[in-house]
UniProtKB/Swiss-Prot annotation:
The keyword Oxidoreductase applies. The gene is pdxB. Keywords: Cytoplasm, NAD, Oxidoreductase, Pyridoxine biosynthesis. This is Erythronate-4-phosphate dehydrogenase. The lineage of its organism: Bacteria, Pseudomonadati, Pseudomonadota, Gammaproteobacteria, Enterobacterales. The active site is at R208, E237, H254 (proton donor). It comes from Enterobacter sp. (strain 638). The keyword Thylakoid does not apply. Pathway: Cofactor biosynthesis; pyridoxine 5'-phosphate biosynthesis; pyridoxine 5'-phosphate from D-erythrose 4-phosphate: step 2/5. It catalyses: 4-phospho-D-erythronate + NAD(+) = (R)-3-hydroxy-2-oxo-4-phosphooxybutanoate + NADH + H(+). It is an enzyme of class 1 (oxidoreductase). CDD domains: ErythrP_dh. NAD(+) binds at D146, T175, D232, G257.
């Protein structure tokens, strides 16, 4: 049994070798000749999986170690009798922590407290739901927009997108990409919406590039609209608009979900799905794969305020690192993908063990995703 895996999927060789012969290959472009004698294909979002790629091949199963699936024609896979699995929620925590790092950085730069802002979340799934819980744990007001969930009657105080535009100081997008249909998200943030945002608002896109009309966004910024912008995803990728990059406040190379934990979850989820598909079901404990973090333990004295939270967050991950790396190579062919391929190791907040002498601080840190314990000072 031959299993092709994207060369940038961590732990893929270690895990899939339990099931068969493993060949690691580039994801973009994928070496098509390798598909001729392969039984399974494990990809990331850079590989377009469709009839053009797989027709006439012997592939019996496709796994994508990503939460999003717009790069996979799953309808064609089902029609062709090819098994398929994604990794829903695998990088949700990573994206939430990316958004937090960006907002805390902007708050420090521009002199505002997050607790004084209202955050509108568009798309309240694995990412948006976790973001809501962490923001509300800090006492930050959130407004939720998720038309599919609202129409299903799901529990939640869902608002219209118009309400978010009118009342939110921050609007952050966490939707799938749907190019048509009742819940179309392609260019959901078009020129009309962007121009209606509150003066000084913050616009964040860390889901799919075309959810925000990049040409319209550039036009608004060039005309002097008072708007801060955080973009991790672009239209198009990898050949992003450098003029737009030069005008946004945070620019990164589609790495919001790129924690070591998130990538490992993606690999383990598709491994478990494929092992079940072939009748050899196996489970993997994530902590058996992960190395010790660079910073493992720290002591926090006194209560937790936004300033001390920012220092803890940026000890684990400071988004300015990735912003600087992309700006350094912007416009150079191949460098966008190279940044993603050679991404520096990044951990999640849970990797940091925080000893607190304040019980409320420990409780809040745990609610925010840190690994905190209350140890009263003696």
């Amino acid at each position: 049994m031959k299993i092709l895996v994207d060369e940038n999927m961590p732990y893929a060789r270690e895990l899939f070798s339990r099931l068969g012969e493993v060949k690691a290959v580039p994801g973009r472009p994928i070496p098509v000749a390798e598909l001729d004698d392969a039984d399974a294909l494990m990809v990331r979002s850079v590989t377009k999986v469709n009839e053009t790629l797989l027709a006439g091949k012997g592939i019996k199963f496709v796994g994508t170690a990503t939460a999003g699936t717009d790069h996979v024609d799953d309808a064609w896979l089902a029609k062709a009798g090819i098994g398929f699995s994604a990794a829903p929620g695998c990088n949700a925590i990573a994206v939430v922590e990316y958004v937090f790092s960006s907002l805390l950085m902007l708050g420090e730069r521009d002199g505002f407290a997050l607790q004084d802002r209202t955050v509108g979340i568009v798309g309240v799934g694995n990412v948006g739901g976790r973001l809501q819980k962490r923001l509300e744990a800090m006492g930050i007001r959130t407004l939720l927009c998720d038309p599919p969930r609202a129409d299903r009657g799901d529990e939640g105080d869902f608002r219209s997108l118009d309400e978010l535009v009118e009342h939110a100081d921050v609007i952050t997008f966490h939707t799938p990409l749907f190019k048509d249909g009742a819940y179309k998200t392609f260019h959901l943030a078009d020129e009309t919406l962007i121009r209606r945002l509150k003066p000084g608002a913050i616009l964040i896109n860390a889901c799919r590039g075309p959810v925000v009309d990049n040409a319209a966004l550039l036009k608004c910024l060039e005309e002097g609209q008072n708007l801060s912008v955080v973009l991790d995803v672009w239209e198009p990728e990898p050949d992003l608009n450098v003029a737009l990059l030069n005008r946004v406040d945070v620019a990164t190379a589609h790495i919001a979900g790129y924690t070591l934990e998130g990538k490992a979850r993606g690999t383990t989820q598709v491994f478990e799905a494929y092992s079940a598909f072939i009748g050899n079901a196996q489970q993997v404990a994530l902590d058996t794969l992960l190395p010790a973090p660079e910073f493992g333990r720290i002591t926090l004295h006194g209560p937790l305020d936004e300033s001390s939270l920012k220092r803890l967050v940026h000890l684990v991950y400071d988004v300015r690192r990735d912003d600087a790396l992309l700006r350094k190579v912007a416009g150079i062919p191949g460098e966008f993908d190279k940044l993603r391929k050679n991404y520096l190791e990044r951990r999640e907040w849970s990797s940091l063990y925080v000893i607190c002498d304040d019980a409320d601080a420990a409780a809040l840190l745990n609610n925010l995703g840190f690994n905190a314990v209350h140890n009263p000072a003696r």
